[in-house]
Amino acid sequence: MKSGIHPEYKKFLIKVESDVFETMSTHPTGEILMDVDFRKHPAWNKDSGNVVNQSNKSVSDFNKRFSGLSFGGKKEAS
């Protein structure tokens, strides 16, 4: 391998809530602080519900504006 062209491969910390995971990476900072817990994502955890941050003004505005919009899905029984 040619020397001097590859980034340094070093210990990398992933911090989620009170948990810390250690792995290896070329990321320059050496750590990442996650504000959303990846373990609670609905793609692999159906009990977690919606993980969208409702405090985000853009998301809240979108939900208010389009709350009654139907995309032709199944109709709810009344």
From Swiss-Prot:
One GO biological process term: translation
PROSITE patterns linked: RIBOSOMAL_L31
GO CC field: ribonucleoprotein complex; ribosome
Keywords of this entry: Ribonucleoprotein, Ribosomal protein, RNA-binding, rRNA-binding
Role: Binds the 23S rRNA.
Assembly description: Part of the 50S ribosomal subunit.
Family: Belongs to the bacterial ribosomal protein bL31 family. Type A subfamily.
Protein name from the UniProt record: Large ribosomal subunit protein bL31
